Amino acid sequence: FVACIRETSAYTISNYVIYSDDNGATWNVSGRASVGGDEAKVVELNNGDILMSIRTAGKRWYNISHDGGVTWNETISEWDDLIGPACNGDLIRYDENTLLHSLPKGDSRRDVAIYISKDEGKTWNEGKVIVPRYSAYSSLCVLPDKTIGMFVEEREVDTTSYEMVFYRFPIEYLEAMNQ
């Protein structure tokens, strides 16, 4: 899992991966994966690389580890097709050919959408809005019947209180329309 660490008294946060190679008997900390990002998520790619999606104030950053998360590329890249307005989201593998990423669509905390990548995170589709109102943090899972579950904060008006809501839908719902 990814840990966000403030290494100095400054507000700058770095991301590290905490991992186990022995089913949790012992734990290790990776090298620094990013400086200045927050609330990162990781997914294993088909070739064994680890892809990290990193929250920033603008577009989502990403980084790749080629050694199971022990070390990370020196250069951080950004996705042109994922904005992620300084908000947490989730990144999971649906199947061998499909990654899913949940984030608010646009530049504010509303309209949480799920984006699909069919090329291991190189590009993302336009995204399907799941929550067409104020919404923010979300978590995804693939259920045993291969439907997708999403747990998300949402609210009807611009207040500080959110309700937690669970959605369930088939992958075909996401693939049917890009909006």
Positions of predicted regions on the chain:
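Asp-box/BNR beta-propeller blade signature and adjacent active/binding-site loops
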Residues: F1-Q179
